[in-house]
A protein has these predicted regions:
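Nucleic-acid nuclease catalytic cores
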Residues: 68-76, 83
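A broadly used, surface-exposed interaction patch
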Residues: 49-71
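GIY-YIG nuclease catalytic motif and its immediate N-terminal context
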Residues: 1-53, 80-94
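Intrinsically disordered, low-complexity regulatory tails
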Residues: 96-104
Length: 104
């Protein structure tokens, strides 16, 4: 099983440097005081493109936009090639972290 990458500061420069153009599941994380909280879990067939989409002014999820504006944010990802495996891992991550910006 692939491993989650370590937390990376979330901005367009680090996405360009660290996010691959491959499929996977990702977490968006914010830091408050000395604690870290997952605020969104998603998946994509192109992690770099999707992570950049969230940083764009056109991001439709207001919750994500507010976290990015008001907190120091980070991302982590795991590369997963098959859609069924991405679906499973995304659901497990959402069930585990209960991120505030995911809607059901």
């Amino acid at each position: 099983m692939p491993e989650w990458i370590d937390r990376v500061p979330y901005n367009s420069g680090t996405v360009d440097l660290y996010a691959p153009e491959t499929a996977g599941v990702y977490r968006l994380i914010y830091k408050s005081n000395d604690d870290y909280y997952v605020f969104y879990v998603g998946q994509s067939d192109n992690l770099k493109e999707r992570l950049k989409d969230h940083l764009s002014p056109g991001e439709p999820n207001e919750c994500i936009k507010n976290h990015l504006k008001n907190h120091d944010c980070f991302f982590r990802y795991i590369e997963i090639g098959t859609q069924s495996e991405r679906d499973r891992i995304e659901r497990e991550e959402i069930d585990h972290w209960k991120p505030s910006c995911n809607t059901v």
